[in-house]
């Protein structure tokens, strides 16, 4: 059994006692309908058990820091290797995380720049070299006479620890004072205790000198002593002013600016020596945004133009009104004039303050008084309140009027100017990281280095180049290393982790991947498959959960799980080669692979009318000042290779611009000149794959609103009326009807010391969530718990005579979710299922026919059979007169659209233009469109 993984009796989620044997060291694909149990078998069984066994091998001391993993519900698994999961979850929300840091390429770059980087003066740009003791003394002697200075030897710079031995060594060397974290201590007299978990700066105080004629000899001795003690560094502290750092290593002879010893940590935007001290290494600052303070400049102050003041602030007896009257008198500021008609000087006074003192008339205690008032301006006042306030509420209110802007000091580079003055091949580390990955490889190839530098950097350059090439092979050549990880799509972040794993060259590992083809254009699919095969060829087992036909055909072994979804799934329908799957009549996947089932091209398409939503001059990220039209009342697909600008155009500009204008959203859209045709829509809805709720309390019944009607129904029964129960009695979120032992959760958490927490059904309500009295109320012999455990299909039959409930449930069935239980916790729903519940909710609402729906890759997690259902829903929404805009790579969806907007031609800087737009047939005729070339085969 060494060459096989044997699973016996898997019962996780909907798996029905599954037995399966999978070959090791092969490329295996798990496929099946959305919700059939693929992820339950791959992630919740195989990966969970592989991880758990590895954790169990660690000591109990180590396990308490790592947290525990539950044992999956499976009899046994044989032949399991340590498992690594590469899933769709994005790489966290930390703004410090970049593509470079996630892939660890940035660590090698820091090493490269530290070893062969050429330092320049950050002021004059001149290449700088090491400073002698005489040069240091001459620079210090230029200070004004009678200036008091301290000569310090920086022995510790930003290192954790108590440093007891070091302080003892300083004392033994004859020094009586030491400066720690900016404070001077007497070594003999003061008790020095440092927090070992904090980073400290420790400097031995070598001498205190007053600058005057004839002091050069003493200063030279002191500087030499400090340089010797601190390995080439000396700090001159001008009493009451800032420190001057000198180095025997590098300094500018003209400007006198020194750079400390060049080390890899200098290039880290997380380390105190390297990071910009204004933005703290993040590259952006949260600042008051003028456009959010005055969202509508066509209004006057009296009409409520100043958003933070609200409507009720401008009563004539208010202090603000008194100040405005004084401004009006002194600076001719007309409070009844639209803000857009103010000249620049007047607007600046309103926002940033008046230079002169104002005389403000104000009625206080029924007595009119005149106050002298220095008006600081709306924005300056908000800044001050934000800085001074300790109230989280006030801070969060002011944050509504703030946005992230590039740091004024580092311009978004995150590092100090001294660090950015160090170059390799005339580029600093930020300039290198800002290049697209494909250009970085050619830059490294053409680097001209001295023989000495070639020898030093050979191994580092090899590591950087191989990792960059792995990123290119998974279709990410358009990204740059400075890109924030949180701005990546799920597919991009997964492929970055895949490239990182290939870079680590581990062997004998079980890799489990979740739809790596998501977000990838058909053109790049072959490279991705080759990359996965490469991972297998070096000696690993790959299990890939996938619906993509090319990936399924490329697999060595295929497992089809079904036959249906949810309670109708959880069984192995077929397992074997591609031919085995094709020959299995029960396999829906097989039927699509053989062409027995397929998604048909629509016989006729809707034609674009006269109405369009038009974006003019879009130039956010890589968009090159493009103009684009979206026909109103049509189903439009936005296509193009990965990184061509689809998400920027649709999510950052179209959605955010309309959301700001229609819903007065606080989020700023990307850069564009104007947007026309807004009058054609009255509502904009983004239907994404985020969960319908974050806790097990939210479920399909609560999200779609059907649970409110059901609770009213139970409250209207004869028994409920007799007992005086209202609809709230049947909610598990509030006191009254719910079981108070488990607070309506149905489960109770039992904490274990060295094992994972155990969740057991509540022994009071037996997992039913409600108390005994509530469960005694029945409708057609079913209590509220029985109802929540019904599938949508069963509930449809149960409520067939109640149209209000039936219509809402029917839309859930129409989107292919008949198998889902009404009370199924949202945490147990896949992204595709969550998105379809949102679609069902939209379908159940009364349509105005003027809604714009935006969907970003809705086929994620969907089997071809589910894609067929999705297309019919999108067509239904469009038939109701709505406008649907979808970002998609799936050719089945693209061929069914009425209209296509294709971006390209490539990703990153080589993208961002509109290649073509029109019907699928028109796009297919365009020879410069990659989408068109693949579409041609489908039509």
From Swiss-Prot:
PROSITE patterns: ABC_TRANSPORTER_1, ABC_TRANSPORTER_2
GO biological process: nucleotide-excision repair; SOS response
Database matches in Pfam families: UvrA_DNA-bind (PF17755), UvrA_inter (PF17760)
Positions contributing to ATP binding: 32-39, 640-647
Main subcellular localisation: cytoplasm
Zinc finger (C4-type): 252-279, 739-765
Keyword Zinc attached: yes
InterPro entries: AAA+_ATPase, ABC_transporter-like_ATP-bd, ABC_transporter-like_CS, ATP_grasp_subdomain_1, P-loop_NTPase, UvrA, UvrA_DNA-bd, UvrA_inter
Metal-binding listed as a keyword: yes
Record's keyword terms, sorted: ATP-binding, Cytoplasm, DNA damage, DNA excision, DNA repair, DNA-binding, Excision nuclease, Metal-binding, Nucleotide-binding, Repeat, SOS response, Transport, Zinc, Zinc-finger
Homology family: Belongs to the ABC transporter superfamily. UvrA family.
HAMAP family: UvrA
PANTHER family per record: UVRABC SYSTEM PROTEIN A (PTHR43152:SF3)
Full protein name: UvrABC system protein A
Organism of derivation: Clostridium acetobutylicum (strain ATCC 824 / DSM 792 / JCM 1419 / IAM 19013 / LMG 5710 / NBRC 13948 / NRRL B-527 / VKM B-1787 / 2291 / W)
Annotated gene: uvrA
């Amino acid at each position: 059994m060494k060459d096989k993984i044997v699973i016996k009796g898997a019962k996780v989620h909907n798996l029905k006692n599954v037995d399966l044997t999978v070959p090791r060291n092969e490329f295996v694909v798990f496929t099946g309908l959305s919700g059939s149990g693929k992820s339950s078998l791959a992630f919740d069984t195989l990966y969970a058990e592989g991880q758990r066994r590895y954790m169990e091998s660690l000591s109990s001391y180590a396990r308490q820091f790592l947290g525990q993993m539950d044992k999956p519900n499976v009899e046994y698994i044989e032949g399991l290797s340590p498992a690594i999961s590469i899933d769709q979850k994005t790489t966290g929300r930390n703004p410090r995380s970049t593509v470079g840091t996630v892939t660890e390429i940035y660590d090698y770059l820091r090493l490269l720049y530290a070893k062969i980087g050429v330092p320049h003066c950050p002021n004059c740009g001149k290449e700088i070299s090491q400073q002698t003791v005489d040069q240091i003394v001459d620079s210090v002697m230029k200070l004004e006479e009678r200036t008091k200075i301290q000569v310090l030897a920086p022995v510790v710079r930003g290192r954790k620890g108590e440093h007891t031995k070091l302080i003892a060594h300083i004392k033994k060397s004859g020094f009586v004072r030491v400066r720690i974290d900016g404070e001077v201590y007497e070594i003999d007299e003061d008790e020095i205790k440092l927090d070992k978990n904090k980073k400290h700066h420790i400097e031995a105080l070598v001498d205190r000198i007053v600058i005057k004629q004839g002091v050069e000899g003493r200063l030279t001795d002191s500087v030499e002593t400090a340089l010797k003690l601190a390995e080439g560094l000396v700090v001159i502290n001008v009493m009451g002013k800032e420190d001057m750092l000198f180095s025997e290593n590098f300094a500018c002879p003209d400007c006198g600016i020194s750079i400390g010893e060049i080390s890899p940590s200098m290039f880290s935007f997380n380390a105190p020596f390297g990071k910009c001290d204004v933005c703290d290494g993040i590259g952006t600052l949260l600042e008051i945004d003028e456009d959010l303070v005055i969202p509508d400049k066509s209004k006057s102050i009296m009409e409520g133009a100043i958003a933070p003041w609200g409507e009720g602030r401008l009563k004539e007896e208010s202090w603000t009104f008194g100040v405005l009257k004084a401004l009006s008198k002194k600076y001719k500021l007309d409070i009844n004039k639209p803000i857009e008609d103010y000249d620049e000087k007047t607007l600046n006074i309103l926002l940033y303050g008046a230079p002169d003192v104002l005389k403000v008339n104000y009625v206080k205690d029924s007595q009119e008084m005149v106050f002298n008032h220095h008006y600081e301006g709306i924005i300056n006042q908000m800044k001050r309140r934000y800085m001074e306030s300790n109230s989280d509420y006030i801070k969060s209110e002011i944050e509504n009027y703030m946005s992230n802007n590039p740091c004024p000091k580092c311009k978004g580079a995150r590092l100090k100017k001294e660090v950015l003055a160090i170059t390799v091949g005339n580029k600093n580390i930020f300039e290198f990281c800002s290049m697209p990955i494909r250009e970085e490889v050619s830059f490294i190839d053409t680097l001209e280095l001295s023989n000495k530098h070639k020898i030093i950097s050979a191994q580092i350059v090899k590591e950087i180049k191989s990792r960059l090439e792995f990123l290119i092979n998974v279709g990410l050549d358009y990204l740059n290393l400075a890109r924030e990880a949180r701005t990546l799509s799920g597919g991009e972040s997964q492929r970055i982790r895949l490239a990182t794993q290939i870079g680590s060259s581990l062997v004998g590992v079980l890799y489990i991947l979740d739809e790596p083809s998501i977000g990838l254009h058909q053109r790049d699919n072959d490279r991705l498959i080759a990359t996965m095969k490469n991972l297998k060829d070096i000696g690993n087992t790959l299990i890939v959960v996938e619906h993509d036909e090319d990936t399924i055909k490329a697999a060595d072994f295929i497992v089809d799980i079904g036959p249906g979804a949810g309670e109708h799934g959880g069984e192995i329908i077929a397992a074997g080669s591609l031919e085995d799957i094709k020959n299995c009549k029960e396999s829906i996947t097989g039927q699509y692979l053989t062409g027995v089932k397929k998604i048909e091209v629509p016989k006729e398409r809707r034609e674009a009318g006269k109405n369009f939503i038009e974006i003019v001059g879009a130039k956010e990220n890589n968009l090159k000042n493009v103009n684009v039209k979206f026909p109103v009342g049509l189903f439009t697909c936005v296509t193009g290779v990965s990184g061509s600008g689809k998400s920027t155009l649709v999510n950052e500009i179209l959605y955010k611009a309309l959301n700001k204008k229609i819903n007065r959203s606080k989020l700023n859209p990307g850069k564009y000149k104007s947007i026309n045709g807004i009058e054609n829509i009255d509502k904009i809805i983004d239907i994404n794959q985020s969960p319908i709720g974050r806790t097990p309390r939210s479920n399909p019944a609560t999200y779609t609103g059907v649970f409110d009607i059901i609770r009213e129904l139970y409250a209207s029964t004869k028994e409920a009326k007799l007992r005086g129960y209202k609809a709230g009695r049947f909610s598990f979120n509030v006191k009254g009807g719910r079981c108070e032992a488990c607070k309506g959760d149905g489960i109770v958490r039992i904490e274990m010391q060295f094992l994972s927490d155990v969740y057991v059904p509540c022994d009071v309500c037996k997992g039913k969530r409600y108390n005994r009295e509530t469960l005694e109320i029945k409708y057609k012999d079913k209590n509220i718990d029985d109802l929540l455990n019904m599938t949508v299909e069963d509930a449809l039959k149960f409520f067939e005579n109640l149209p209000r409930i039936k219509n809402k449930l029917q839309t859930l069935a129409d989107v292919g979710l008949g198998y889902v239980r009404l009370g199924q916790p949202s945490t147990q729903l896949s992204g595709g299922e969550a998105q379809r519940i949102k679609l069902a909710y939209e379908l159940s609402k009364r349509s105005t026919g003027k809604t714009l729906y935006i969907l970003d890759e809705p086929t994620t997690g969907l089997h071809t059979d589910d894609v067929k259902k999705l297309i019919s829903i999108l067509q239904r929404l469009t038939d109701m007169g709505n406008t649907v805009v979808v970002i998609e790579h799936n050719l089945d969806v693209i061929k069914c659209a009425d209209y296509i907007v294709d971006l390209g031609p490539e990703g990153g800087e080589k993208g961002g233009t509109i290649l073509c737009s029109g019907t699928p047939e028109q796009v297919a005729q365009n020879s410069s469109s990659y989408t068109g070339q693949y579409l041609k085969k489908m039509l």
